Amino acid sequence: MALLTPTQIQSIKEHMTDDPSVLTKKFKAKKTPYETRSISLNELEGYLSEGWEEVSTSKHKAKIQKLKPIDIRFEDDIWCMFYNLGFRILNYDENLVIPWGKNSEDRHQIDVVAVGEEAIFVVECKATENIKQASFKKEIGEICLYKEGVMRVLKEIYGQEKKVKFIFATRNYT
């Protein structure tokens, strides 16, 4: 029995990619801890006041960079790990939302999805700048709530024979 409409399947697939050139570009962008941009020189002062730093300048353009937030850096590190492990179907961006139930509010944003030959990995990432203690009882409970529905959806799209594994990854939490 189909759980998703063709529109929902298309919406999920729009946030996934298996295009080698797109994956290579994404990998290069994600493996650096900095977000970089090329801007016109007349925009430079505004960006510098927002915490960006100037890397280089040419006649009309400036290259600037800013350290990515810790949560984005951690998600990027996990994404790159799966890419380095040979996974070639990965989420394109961090806007992948998967409907897991019948109600319209039964949707969950997924940080990293990696589809392999035999398995699909669904990763929820939590990171903090400074080491601190935390209990993730609420987050684990939420995963238990949507796990079965997300598994059904991913198997419907990528094949019933695939195993779906959930990972709760943390950085700087004890």
Language model: regions and residue ranges:
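Intrinsically disordered, low-complexity Ser/Thr/Pro/Gly-rich regulatory segments
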Residues: 1-174
